[in-house]
């Protein structure tokens, strides 16, 4: 084929190709951070506009260097990965007092969102967080004001690195002491830094 014949063919192929989508970006005023793990980096947007207490709390721990050397200690494929509170030996790090539960902020636990981990007590969240690797709206969203229905606060979302979250969720795991779903090989959070 001559170059002139190839040109229309290339133009047709280019026009029918799937459009490339740009990675999502943070809304103006919402901070972004990089969670560096032993399996790769996860870049997140923090919803300062919708979950100010949770975001300020998370950033306080980030600025203190608290997360460096902690692990994802609970990973469940098809559900979520949880970390930010234990050392690789599963020793819980001391934290600041618990914060208010912002589950009523109308944000949902869709795939790739970040939530504040807590115990059964509604206002028990401190440093630990989780990333939803599936749509968990039915299980974790705010559905009412009883303890069973109150839900967990969403405070951010993954902008890039969701494949890292999926890798973490897929690692082999076991029971270790009182903890279920612990990675056999620790998945370490090397650090978290805010992107200016």
Language model features: what each stretch is:
Residues 10-196:
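Cyclophilin-like peptidyl-prolyl cis-trans isomerases
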């Amino acid at each position: 084929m001559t170059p002139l014949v190839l040109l229309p063919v290339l133009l047709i192929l280019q026009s029918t190709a799937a459009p490339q989508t740009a990675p999502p970006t943070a809304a103006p005023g919402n901070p972004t951070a990089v969670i560096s793990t032993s399996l790769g980096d996860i870049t997140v947007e923090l919803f300062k506009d919708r979950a100010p207490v949770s975001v300020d709390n998370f950033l306080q721990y980030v600025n203190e260097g608290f997360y460096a050397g902690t692990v994802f200690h609970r990973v469940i494929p098809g559900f979520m990965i949880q970390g930010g509170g234990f050392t690789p030996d599963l020793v819980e790090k001391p934290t600041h007092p618990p914060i208010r539960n912002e589950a009523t902020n109308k944000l949902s636990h869709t795939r790739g969102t970040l939530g504040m981990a807590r115990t059964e007590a509604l206002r028990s969240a401190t440093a630990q967080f989780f990333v939803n690797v599936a749509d968990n709206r039915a299980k974790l969203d705010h559905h009412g004001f009883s303890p069973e229905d109150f839900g967990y606060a969403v405070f951010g979302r993954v902008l890039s690195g969701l494949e890292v979250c999926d890798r973490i969720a897929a690692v082999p795991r076991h029971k270790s002491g009182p903890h279920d779903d612990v990675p056999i090989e620790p998945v370490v959070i090397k650090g978290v830094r805010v992107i200016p």
